[in-house]
Amino acid sequence: SIFWMIPRLFLKKLGEVALPTAQLCKDIWASEKTFAWQIHKSLYDAAQDLNLNTELGEIAQLAQRCQGDRNFRILSYNYDDFLEQYLDFLNVRCCSMFTTKIRYSNGRDSADFYGMNGQPNQSLRLYHVHGFLPKVATRDQLDTLHMRSICLTEADYNMLYNQPYSWPIASQLSFFRENTCLFIGCSLSDPNIRRLLEITAYNLPKHYAIFSMTYKSTDAHGSTTTKQLTSKDRLQIENHFYRIGINILWVKDYREIPVWLHNLNQSIV
């Protein structure tokens, strides 16, 4: 986590909420490159070797099976290039897409810049709508456009979601309107994403999200236990997400997601 250096008093005041805490990190690390490098370290320092039996490995294999379908594309809210690494391992041609604002020397904002690796019409399209920070060896190798693509702080999100015609917003609306989406590893708690889903919701939900039937519960003494949702809990959650166009697919716990995805892969002819 990039938050480990934040004094506990500040975290207590902020309630350890991600957006204002990220904003505080950016305020402390005033240098754009220093802040981006801290994010980079939090993403890649503990990275594990590629394993096709993991969630990302199965997603990459699913993409490999579907790469010939021009309607198949991937939207990621992650900043890392782990999925790209898996796709490269499987020889799947991938176009990583992101956007940022660049500033001219006279202080005027330019139009949106779209960064892409490869040609979107000739490869799988992977949309990084909250920014893209691929792995590099050293701090000095960080690319300015990648650094300025990151949407992480309170100010970043406020600016992004107050621009209804921006590329990230238009891309998400396009996905939600034109595709049947499967949400993997996404809690769907972000109010901005929920608002876009609600805007595009139809009479019958057409999207799907994988949720776990178990959850972590912490008591007053700080002890954590694993509990299971009751059938009533699950029904209430299903009804809640039905309103914004989401059907819930239940697994016993999140460790089952790779198995679920593997079975989906095997079912595709």
Predicted regions and their residues:
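Active-site gating loop/helix substructures
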Residues: R93-F176
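Metabolite-binding pocket within alpha/beta catalytic cores that recognizes anionic/polar moieties
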Residues: S31-S96, T100-K101
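Short, flexible loop segments at the rims of nucleotide/cofactor-binding pockets, characterized by
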Residues: Y44-L52, A155-P164, T226-K227
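A short secondary-structure junction signal
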Residues: E84-F89, A137-R148, N192-L197
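Short, solvent-exposed loop/turn segments at secondary-structure junctions
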Residues: Y79-F82, F132-V136, S187-S189
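Glycine/proline-rich loop-helix segments at beta-alpha junctions forming the active-site rim
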Residues: Y77, I102-Y104, Y202-N203, F241
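SIR2/sirtuin-family catalytic core signature
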Residues: S1-M5, K12-P20, A30, T34-F35, ...
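Short loop/turn segments at strand-loop or loop-helix junctions that form parts
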Residues: Y79, H128-F132, M213-K216
